[in-house]
Amino acid sequence: DDDGKTFTKTYYSEGGIVEFVELIDKNANRQPLIPTVIYCDGLDAASNVTVEVAMQYNAGYQEHIFSYVNNINTIEGGTHVAGFRRSITRVFKSYGEKQGMFDKAKVTIEGDDFREGISAIISVKVPEPQFEGQTKTKLGNSEVMGVVDTTLSRVLEAYLEENPRDAKTIIQKVILAAQARAAAKRARDMVQRKSVLVGGGLPGKLADCQSKDASQSELFLVEGDSAGGTAKQGRNREFQAVL
């Protein structure tokens, strides 16, 4: 201190990063989707890299990931975060496909869908960390990605097999995220397409179709508002447009 005396401060949390995940969700009023925080830890003998991960799905729509290397907050992420994302995408995708849940949903699943509503803490201990990025807060050690991926995947696979109800809840959330993303894209494409058509000088009374494939689309020309209304009601919106 200012007087030259040595003092120490000890910070201790009995629950560790599991309690950390619970705290950040509680402080943000995020409702847990599953009752348990999924936790894993491990030491890779070859690289001497230690991994700790705690993750929890909630009812929200955002991804909240906090990553650390040797207790340094890596705000730009890095290979440890990449390994985490690769693991949850691969493991949950494999489980959903094996259970046939994605086939029933008839929607394309992307990596972001698996991370919607997830809160996670990733903490690794690396003997010789290599930091990158503008502020040197991005981990660059390539070997860490595989260590995190392998360590987390082993625990996730066992968790899903042992907790089928939680697994189903998570996969259903993933599917809902994919469906919402696809619906938003369709709505955005329709608005942009109509803007282009109207801006190009086409009549405002064009009832466009949803298909973008001109070879599979049909355009019906009708005279009068009455006939136009009848045609719109009887058409197939997927590939039939009415003018």
Which sequence ranges carry the predicted segments?
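GHKL-family ATPase ATP-binding module
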Residues: 1-243
